[in-house]
């Protein structure tokens, strides 16, 4: 909104030209979302406490988690508001990628919000049924996929890019649609599974968003894309502002979510953040790189899948408890140690992913 106002006033005062620069607007997006989260956060937490919107804790989990019962949850709504406001203020709202990324994120937030509400209303940790949750996730993801497929302006926008190999592009055709579904739904649920410790999911989400922001900037810049040997996708660079908003909102939320957490994001935040990372990777055509940068989310998900498969096939469990972070807790690792080590791993994986920009 303010971007369009500044462009309209460009002829009145030349200083408004600065708003045409993507980097400047991204910085504003970071600061705006961060400011909203930090300023509004205490009031949101207080309101959640007053309405007794507290976390329900499983009694079969680590005993140390029982003390978390009653901690305010659904704080992810704060993240979504901060992201939405910052994105709407500083993005080019005529850009289709901005809208598909923002609306997909918010839609998954609504799904997560309904899930959180049912948990609170029913007084247990079950929430929305897995079938219902999966159905609505599929509906939203397919809508985004069909939109991107139908508005694609070149075959590159619906092709799979293989990292490390220059000019290796696999045209997908209609297979692009199920790929988008898999990436968005998979990423959403992976982040949700990871969100089991204080700050464990939010900082890796911020770090991966930062990595994808670099890819988005390069992908949307014809000169950089040509130099780096990656596909040029016109308009994709504009989602960097959204990435900045996510980073700012995430850091602001981490201020209150760091151990010991004053508030949890709930499914309203976790499902939305995962979907955001997934749809961002699709827009910049780096779905395979997302697997690397989001390796912590991938491993957490695989630990659950392996645990379930092993128990059903052999009656034995591979891990003491899944997802993987609970396994380390039950081994005696203090919660902060698990969290920080997962953060460190994510930093390394994001750097590896960024290195693939040049290694071709």
From Swiss-Prot:
Catalytic activity: UDP-N-acetyl-alpha-D-muramoyl-L-alanyl-gamma-D-glutamyl-meso-2,6-diaminopimeloyl-D-alanyl-D-alanine + di-trans,octa-cis-undecaprenyl phosphate = di-trans,octa-cis-undecaprenyl diphospho-N-acetyl-alpha-D-muramoyl-L-alanyl-D-glutamyl-meso-2,6-diaminopimeloyl-D-alanyl-D-alanine + UMP
Keyword Transmembrane helix: yes
Top EC class, one word: transferase
Membrane-spanning residues: 26-46, 70-90, 97-117, 132-152, 168-188, 199-219, 236-256, 263-283, 288-308, 338-358
One example GO MF annotation: UDP-N-acetylmuramoyl-L-alanyl-D-glutamyl-meso-2,6-diaminopimelyl-D-alanyl-D-alanine:undecaprenyl-phosphate transferase activity
GO biological process: cell division; cell wall organization; peptidoglycan biosynthetic process; regulation of cell shape
Protein biosynthesis among keywords: no
GO cellular component, as recorded: plasma membrane
This protein's UniProt keywords: Cell cycle, Cell division, Cell inner membrane, Cell membrane, Cell shape, Cell wall biogenesis/degradation, Magnesium, Membrane, Metal-binding, Peptidoglycan synthesis, Transferase, Transmembrane, Transmembrane helix
Family that this chain belongs to: Belongs to the glycosyltransferase 4 family. MraY subfamily.
Name of this chain's protein: Phospho-N-acetylmuramoyl-pentapeptide-transferase
